[in-house]
Curated annotation (Swiss-Prot):
Location(s), subcellular: Cytoplasm
Any GO BP: tRNA modification
Pfam families (UniProt xref): ATP_bind_3
One annotated Gene Ontology cellular component of this protein: cytoplasm
Cytoplasm listed as a keyword: yes
Protein name from the UniProt record: tRNA(Ile)-lysidine synthase
Amino acid sequence: MLYEKFEYNINNLIGNFGLSKIAVAVSGGSDSVALLYLANIWAEKNNIELSVISVDHNLREQSKQETYYVQNISNSLNRKHYSLSFDHQNNFSNLQERARAGRYDLMTNLCLEFDILVLLTAHHEDDYVENFCLRLERNSGIFGLSSSNINWYNNIQIIRPLYNIPKSELVEYLVSHNIKWFEDESNSSDKYRRNIIRQKLAKGAGYIKAEIILQQLKINDLLDNKFKPELISAIAEAVKIFEYGFAFLDLVKFDKFSNEVKVQIINFLLIIISGQFRAARFYSVEPILKLITQDVNFKNTLHGCVVKRIQNELLIYREFGKKLPESKILLDKSIIWDNRFCITKNQENPDCVITYLSLEDYKTIKKQLDLAHLKDLSCKNHNAILFTLPIIKILEKVIAIPHISYYDNDMQNFEVSFAPNFVSRFTHFC
């Protein structure tokens, strides 16, 4: 039965996590509505608080009806429902990608607000097959062609318990239980490449889908047994990440690893240093890899970072002005700034604002700054890095730059730590 398969999947994916809360993303389509009912049964059996999240992308007239329908289902199941809205700002370029990122930003921020650590999504077996075909068309490497049933976004664990369940089984479950759902009319449009691939797969023989699933399993196995261990070794051996939010890559050690792993190392560092949630495209990383092989110093920008070769090392630091966050008021004891730094205040301070250093501020306090340590660690790139660090201001006056122990008043006491979104157990800070 479908529920037994779902229960086996979710228990294996979550393990002994000791959860008391969990969220499920539900759009109103057949996949996510089926997931909601399955997750509700599982949550009841395990005494877990289940929250339902819907995101209206404001792109279709039907979307508000879908959200209202999901809200009614949630109410009937005595589950909390949260309706979120994505603002596309009438910008329709690269809309699918932006909408996806916006959707996950909204959902994971809500999870963080309510201390929910896990979000369930309705990606099923057919979705995995379509993703494989799309990535194959884009000439993705082995990491890109692999699939994962557990991912992280904004420090929230995204779990896909329907990964080995075809859409047909989900629809059959809903029909047998007389449960309605909405069909997204855009799914039949030839405007999107995914839909064209879906139509071709539907017309093809069943063995084509089975062969794709088999190939993906082989790739996942190769990744787990060869490339992931190599990636762990590469990062442990060749990477140094500093509390100032920059990193050095030892290019001599880097050179001995496979090209697939090299791409992942660069992307790993770009995600951590930029504070972004998503990796750069391969076509963006490839020019950097080519420059590295030329054995000459260079300085490029990529993915919100400056990438600079200094002899046998690659320095990566945050690019100034590239979507650095606006000022944030430090209302609570601690705050995450730029998705990279955690700032904690050890005493009450009125109207503290976290921001970055402006040129005017720098000119005012320049003579009082001790940058010797940062200068030494960063191979004299201290000034560029300084302008990407968090500072604390009161009434437009800089009162603290904790990284370099600058305090306008001895009574002002703050702590700062580098806390990027994507940190693995083999990452070490210097």
